Amino acid sequence: MEELRQTKNFTKRDYRLSENKLFYNHSKFGNSNEIDIPFENIEGEKVSHKISNNNTLFFSVLVYIVAIALFISKINNGGDDQSVSLFWAVIATIILAFYWFNRDDFWKIKLTDNNYLYIHKNIPNKEIPENFINSLISKRNEYLKENYLIIDENLDYQSQLSNFKWLKSIGAISKIEFEEKYLELKATVNPRKTDIGFGK
């Protein structure tokens, strides 16, 4: 899967993969923001993240307390009309429903600038976002290997080794792949080779 579209509560999130980057468009109430994220900027760490407005939950509980207090007050005063307490109980229930409806369950993917990419876990269903994330990581790994897991005897040893370490740290290559490339690098490029001046 190369595209993912998610819509919830007037918010649209569109994700599209190219050969070397992820295009992300976020729009809400007609305001749109589109950015492109190079694969180099996607660290790939995926964690579960829930977003909810606890103030709304607190307000709902507060209104329930008011409804209960009014109900008890009417009983203590011998009143039979509970319409006021019922009204506030209905209001509290509506607020609680709003709270549950607006809770968001995301996959949070870390980016190199300490920002995160958020992808709904269950929109349009559970399987499609999972497949898209797998495609994203697979395409990222493929691109990074093609461009950074190469050995060139004319390039600096240390910078090439740093590339291999970076690829291993973000999970683009395995430890075994790293060790194989490391041995190949040492056999191809002299670690003590200097770029400036004269060697002794």
Descriptions of predicted regions:
Residues K121-K200:
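Charged, low-complexity cytosol-facing tails and large interhelical loops of integral membrane proteins
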Residues S27, V47-K50, F98, K121:
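Surface loops and adjacent helix of pleckstrin homology
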Residues L96-L117:
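Transmembrane-cytosolic junction motif
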Residues F29-S32, N115-Y116, K126:
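Short, surface-exposed beta-strand-loop junctions and turns on beta-sheet-rich folds
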Residues L22-Y24, E34-K50:
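Phosphoinositide-dependent membrane-docking surfaces
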Residues M1-E34:
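Short, non-transmembrane cytosolic segments of multipass membrane proteins
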Residues S52-R103:
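Alpha-helical transmembrane spans
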